[in-house]
């Protein structure tokens, strides 16, 4: 069982990832590999229902042919979950993602009222893989800082399984 530091707008606590958390995080990583195999950026996110059944998932669609830079996996999965779950269910839902949500996606997660985020690859580690690639400009703004500015808390667990998540990025951002 992996132990991580959980942070929300109010406090930090030590929390262990469950076997279900690890299973769903690995599924998000697998979906990021599938996104890459389709010629997309190697990112993915999913939201399960209370029973652990995936009800929303998305790979990254922010590059051609769509060319919409807002179509990050986390934003798309959060929006799909918001269309399918009640406000109460969203507040107790978890979004699993192959990489730490950027500030745009953290805002979308917050506005969708998703109560918990579990991520694999940290923004800092991602930057070491992408460098200054023009298709992945980054902010030095951890999602925890975005959530900390809100009126309700979002529990954040991660990074976890970083080496597994990094494999989908190997060689993608070079050349």
What spans do the regions from the language model cover?
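Zinc-dependent deaminase
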Residues: 1-35, 108-175
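Conserved redox-active cysteine motifs that mediate thiol-disulfide chemistry
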Residues: 99, 103-106, 111
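Immediate flanking context of iron-sulfur cluster ligation sites
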Residues: 87-100
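Short beta->alpha transition motifs characteristic of CBS
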Residues: 55-62, 122
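Small-residue (primarily alanine) positions within well-ordered alpha-helices
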Residues: 28, 32-35, 45, 56, ...
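A short, polar/acidic, helix/strand-boundary loop motif
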Residues: 18, 60-65
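A short, polar/charged loop-to-alpha-helix boundary motif
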Residues: 63-75, 80
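Short beta-strand scaffold segments in enzyme catalytic cores
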Residues: 43-52
């Amino acid at each position: 069982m992996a132990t991580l530091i959980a942070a929300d707008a109010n406090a930090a606590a030590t929390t262990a990832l469950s076997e279900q958390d690890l299973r769903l995080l690995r599924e998000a990583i697998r979906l990021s590999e599938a996104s890459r195999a389709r010629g997309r950026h190697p990112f993915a996110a999913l939201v399960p229902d209370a029973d652990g059944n995936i009800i929303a998932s998305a790979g990254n669609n922010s590059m051609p042919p769509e060319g919409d830079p807002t179509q990050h996996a986390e934003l798309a999965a959060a929006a799909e979950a918001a269309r399918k779950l009640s406000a109460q269910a969203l507040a107790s839902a978890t979004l699993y993602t192959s990489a730490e949500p950027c500030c745009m996606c953290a805002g979308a997660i917050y506005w969708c009222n998703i109560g918990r985020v579990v991520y694999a690859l940290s923004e800092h580690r991602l930057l070491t893989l992408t460098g200054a690639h023009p298709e992945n400009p980054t902010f030095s703004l951890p999602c925890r800082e975005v959530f900390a500015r809100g009126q309700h808390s979002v529990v954040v667990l991660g990074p976890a399984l970083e080496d597994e998540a990094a494999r989908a990025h190997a060689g993608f951002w070079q050349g």
